[in-house]
Design a protein with these regions (language model features):
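Secretory targeting signatures
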Residues: 1-26, 305-335
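Extracytoplasmic substrate-binding proteins
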Residues: 26-28, 35-39, 45, 102-103, ...
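A short, structured surface patch at a secondary-structure boundary
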Residues: 44-99, 103-109, 114, 207-210, ...
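Solvent-exposed loop/turn segments at secondary-structure junctions
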Residues: 52-56, 72-75, 90-92, 103-105, ...
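His/Asp/Glu-enriched short active-site or ligand-binding loop at hydrolase and phosphoryl-transfer sites
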Residues: 70, 195-218
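Short helices/loops that flank or line small-molecule/ion binding pockets
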Residues: 91-101, 116-121, 221-229
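A ligand-binding cleft/hinge motif common to bilobed small-molecule-binding domains
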Residues: 110-120, 234-253
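Acidic/histidine-enriched, beta-strand-rich ligand/metal-binding domains
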Residues: 213-216, 224, 237-239, 247-248, ...
Length: 335
């Protein structure tokens, strides 16, 4: 073999067996907490500390690299086979250390003390907070940058933008925008106000948040609810699910006589939304947006079919997040 041919052969072998090492250039990223990290090599093992992060990781085709998730991570189904490393603020550091990940994708709700401790142990911890549509795009691209899947991330974001733009185009010129309440509980009446993820989805779907005057997530009185009189009421799947699989939060709007005068109740316009897609800033938010557009404007988008009850579909254990709100310790999540 000629020397030049031998040299080329050696290069080809190196390309095959050392491709990842040769093809990776260290990247510097600043996460949503403002912390700067340098990813020296392409991660081969990943721990996700939030359901939203987990969905993004799997959407990018990185499921086989996941070695740890939270007990609230439930999508895709393969996630249920992964080692759990605790909850949000109750992450189990020992289990994370045992998994020995190359990178950890965290959420602010994991607690700054936990995040700082993991960093002191030498782990690359990237904090992601996708609390808006644009924030979701950024989160997907951040994970893509950190894992060498930029092309896949860009493709997902492009598809999401195309689908959202299609909704916006169909709503051009529409002036009838129903008033919408997103209810998380009754007594107290917890609602999604302005500056919330749900408020943005309601607006994009051609509606008006009935409680836009409430900042963030907050409680409104019965009197305010009756006076505001939303045309459409949304509740999350899994919210206070009964043992028979019925959504007791949805049912309570129809059984509480004090609410019988509400327009949404009289017109039976109280809808169940898939909480895993409606409350998580991941790739599937477009599904909820398309469904919400059907609810608000069936004359344009067709009729809406409510999701299967959480009693028979996987993964509504994330509802403890809502329970945390009701208890006064709001853990918004999903993420």
């Amino acid at each position: 073999m000629k020397p030049v041919h031998l040299f080329i052969a050696v290069l080809l072998v190196c390309a095959v067996f050392c491709g990842t090492a040769l093809g990776w250039n260290p990247v510097t990223v600043t996460d949503d907490s403002g912390f700067e990290s340098i990813i020296e090599s392409q991660p081969e093992t990943i721990v996700s500390l939030a359901p939203t992060n987990t969905e993004i990781i799997f959407a990018l085709g990185l499921g086989d690299k996941v070695v740890g998730v939270t007990e609230y991570c439930n999508y895709p189904e393969e996630t249920l086979t992964k080692q759990t490393v605790g909850g949000y603020s109750t992450i189990n550091v020992e289990k994370i250390v045992a998994a020995n990940p190359d990178i950890i994708f965290a959420n602010p709700k994991n607690g700054q003390e936990n995040i700082d401790y993991l960093r002191r142990l030498g782990y690359s911890v990237i904090v992601i907070q996708s609390d808006s549509v644009n924030g979701t795009y950024d989160a997907i691209q951040m994970v893509g940058t950190c894992t060498g899947t930029t092309a896949e991330a860009n493709s997902i974001v492009s598809d999401m933008k195309t689908r959202i733009d299609a909704i916006s185009e169909k709503l051009e010129g529409v002036t009838d925008k129903p008033t919408v309440m997103h209810a998380m509980s009754i007594e107290p009446y917890w609602v999604s106000g302005s500056s919330t993820f749900q408020n943005e989805l309601i607006t994009l779907a051609g509606g008006t948040n009935a409680f836009a005057d409430v900042e963030g997530w907050g409680v409104v009185t019965l009197e305010k609810l009756l006076t505001t009189d939303p045309q459409i009421i949304l509740v999350d799947s899994g919210s206070k699910m009964g043992t028979t699989g019925e959504n007791t939060l949805q049912k309570s709007f129809f059984t509480d006589q004090r609410l019988s005068s509400l327009t949404a109740v009289r017109n039976t316009d109280v809808y169940v939304m898939n909480s895993d897609t409606f409350d998580r800033g991941g790739p599937r938010i477009v599904e909820s947006l398309e469904q919400l557009a059907q609810i608000l404007h069936p004359e344009i988008f067709g009729n809406y079919a409510e999701p299967i009850s959480s009693a028979s579909s996987p993964g509504f254990s994330v509802i403890p997040v809502i329970s945390g709100i009701i208890g006064g310790l709001f853990i918004y999540r999903r993420k």
